[in-house]
Amino acid sequence: MNTVRVTFLLVFVLAVSLGQADKDENRMEMLEKTEQGKSYLDFAENLLLQKLEELEARLLEEDSEESRNSRQKRCIGEGVPRDENDPRCCSGLVCLKPTLHGIWYKSYYCYKK
């Protein structure tokens, strides 16, 4: 009976000590995986940030192109009637006194220089 108790106690002590070692190993393994996960998340975050910055740059570039184009669209083109006091002829055009058809409508037009 005594040998059974000693054997049981010995097995119990070995199981507990090995279990503690496994617990420590598991803890270390979890810490390593967490650190790897953090580095992976940092990498993914940086990659996403780069893509967003590229997208933002493209959008801002398109906005600036649109604003340049929209200014040009606001000017008055060739052969379009306009008021005498409205100096919005497009670049390369000049406002002249009405001639020919402008005389009948008493409108000013933008003509090429």
Swiss-Prot record:
Name of the protein described by the UniProt record: U11-theraphotoxin-Hhn1e
Organism: Cyriopagopus hainanus (Chinese bird spider)
Tissues expressing this chain: Expressed by the venom gland.
Residue span(s) of the pro-peptide: 22-74
UniProt record similarity statement: Belongs to the neurotoxin 14 (magi-1) family. 01 (HNTX-16) subfamily.
Record keyword Membrane present: no
Disulfide bonds: 75-90, 89-110
Subcellular location: Secreted
Domain statement: The presence of a 'disulfide through disulfide knot' structurally defines this protein as a knottin.
UniProtKB keywords: Disulfide bond, Ion channel impairing toxin, Knottin, Secreted, Signal, Toxin
GO molecular function, one term: toxin activity
Function: Probable ion channel inhibitor.
GO cellular component, one term: extracellular region
Lineage: superkingdom: Eukaryota
Secretion signal span: 1-21
Taxonomy of the source species: Eukaryota, Metazoa, Ecdysozoa, Arthropoda, Chelicerata
Feature: compositional bias, Basic and acidic residues: 60-69
Region (Disordered): 60-87
